[in-house]
């Protein structure tokens, strides 16, 4: 009887330890999925923003769309910064957070220009906005490795 209880206790302890590991794996996969989604959003923004900025000079609809995208990218960056990365992704997360600070500031500057009707492709290209967006998308390869 003691042997059976010992075996059951051992199995219970192993199962409990395995659950913690499983939670860590799930947390890592969830983070990877959220980070990849964020990076994809930033990539799409970086691709579309220059054309929208060019059109926004003479097109109210394009200006409104650019403003909406700028606000959306600011919110997405803030939401990403609030994620809790797994230990394996802590350095990558900090790198993206650093880029996010500049991205958010640049988005705010371009948003003000758009609201004042002063946005242009040249202004956008001279801002850190698109450059930081591209730097964030460059981190995608590192994020994909976390999911493996």
Curated annotation (Swiss-Prot):
Spans through the membrane: none
Lipidated sites in chain (N-palmitoyl cysteine): 19
UniProt subcellular location: Cell membrane
Entry GO CC: plasma membrane
N-terminal signal peptide: 1-18
Topology in membrane: Lipid-anchor
Covalent lipid adducts (S-diacylglycerol cysteine), residues: 19
Pfam families the UniProt entry points to: DUF6376
Keywords, ordered alphabetically: Cell membrane, Lipoprotein, Membrane, Palmitate, Signal
Coiled coil, from the record: none
The name this protein goes by in its record: Uncharacterized lipoprotein YybP
Organism expressing this protein natively: Bacillus subtilis (strain 168)
